[in-house]
Amino acid sequence: MRVLVVNCGSSSIKYQFLDMDTEQVLCKGLAERIGIPGSRIVHKKDDQKVVVEKPMKDHEDALKYVLELVVDEKVGGVKDLKEIDAVGHRVVHGGEKFSGSVLIDEEVMRALEEYSYLAPLHNPPNIMGIRAMMKLLPGVPNVAVFDTAFHSKMPAKAYLYAIPYEYYKKYKIRRYGFHGTSHRYVSKRTAEILGLDYHKSKIITVHLGNGASIAAVMNGHSIDTSMGFTPLEGLVMGTRSGDIDPSIVTFLMEKEGLTAEEVYTILNKKSGVLGLTDGFSSDMRDIEGKALEGDPVCRLALDIYEYRIAKYIGAYIAAMNGVDAIAFTAGVGENSPITRKEICENYLSYLGIKIDDEKNNVKGEERIITTPDSKVKVLLVPTNEELMIARDTKEIIEKGLKQLEY
């Protein structure tokens, strides 16, 4: 089975085309600046790279050109569109309705549109991508894989906020969590590497990209996660504040004469390590570099970043009453030996964790980074959300399922 995986953002589309018999990537790429001047597609097959620069007025336009590349004689994955068996879509928010990946029909589309108010920046472009693929590849099944679904079985004690219950009933205000596809892939892969029974294990997954979150995965289910009603809660991120005292919002509105939207923008776009370094950078590579040179501002930002991560790891060990393994993933998690080492040595040595410096100093390569006598194993596991989406799509189509339960 050949599956095209599509991830539609507001002005970009990431895609991968996979042969699921071998789980090999046939070709992949990125369409960017959709609907704005300078739009282009960067397409790759093996070691070949093609850049197509042409106007793309909307997502349908962009996906039409993507499909042309997928069947291109030289850089495509197949010769004919009929060889695309299914399309898997990343969808950010499934609300409370979707606890697993689903085969898309009109009923599902209505539900996705209904839940768009919970993810107004992300769900609408996801929906545009689905509609476009239905039109461009009529008769080809489409599957939605949700960022929120893996966390949907959290107990109420983990997902409810201590605000008047009527707001949960009226607006479904609760913890949803995000990065679920990544946390699911990394936790499963961690269990495989260590030879653990996934459904009898306690794993903490630490997804550190520009957006960052941690999940407590117990017996194969996410029982808690650091992101909440939106991706703003939890860890200190590139530009997001993570956890703050909620009264700071009203305080800033009053003192600075700001609207709710302006404060929201500050917390989402101007905070995190960007805010802590007074606008220097939101990129942890820049901050690490300066911190290692002795810059006190960047060193403090790195300390705050690592301290918050360590606190969440400690909290989730308590939530699961123990831990078998901790796995780092995503851009920072995979490529920052110093972050992994400092978190484990400065805060988690009480667990009997012993980092193997030689193993830890390798970037982006799947491995155990602790010594053989480390009581708790720590791993570097590169995430692969596209493969997870393709696997779900294949399983749903081959088994004739309407919905996949994790």
Swiss-Prot record:
Principal localisation: cytoplasm
Do the record's keywords include Cytoplasm? yes
This protein's UniProt keywords: ATP-binding, Cytoplasm, Kinase, Magnesium, Metal-binding, Nucleotide-binding, Transferase
Reaction it catalyzes = acetate + ATP = acetyl phosphate + ADP
> Where, subcellularly, is it found?
Cytoplasm
Give the domain of life: Bacteria
Biological process GO annotation list? acetate metabolic process; acetyl-CoA biosynthetic process
Q: Where is the signal peptide?
A: none
EC number, UniProt record: 2.7.2.1
Q: Which SUPFAM superfamilies match?
A: Actin-like ATPase domain
Give binding positions for ATP.
K14, H207, L208, G209, N210, G211, D283, M284, R285, G331, V332, G333, E334, N335
Co-factor(s): Mg(2+); Mn(2+)
Q: Where is the active site?
A: D147
The keyword Transferase appears for this protein? yes
Q: Which GO terms describe its molecular function?
A: acetate kinase activity; ATP binding; magnesium ion binding
PROSITE patterns referenced in this protein's UniProt entry, alphabetically: ACETATE_KINASE_1, ACETATE_KINASE_2
Q: In the record's cofactor note, how is the cofactor described as bound?
A: Mg(2+). Can also accept Mn(2+).
Site (Transition state stabilizer) location in chain: H179, R240
UniProt: substrate binding residues = R90
Q: Which family does it belong to?
A: Belongs to the acetokinase family.
Q: What does this protein do?
A: Catalyzes the formation of acetyl phosphate from acetate and ATP. Can also catalyze the reverse reaction.
Quaternary structure and interacting proteins, as annotated = Homodimer.
Q: What is this protein called?
A: Acetate kinase
Protein's organism: Fervidobacterium nodosum (strain ATCC 35602 / DSM 5306 / Rt17-B1)
Q: Which gene encodes it?
A: ackA
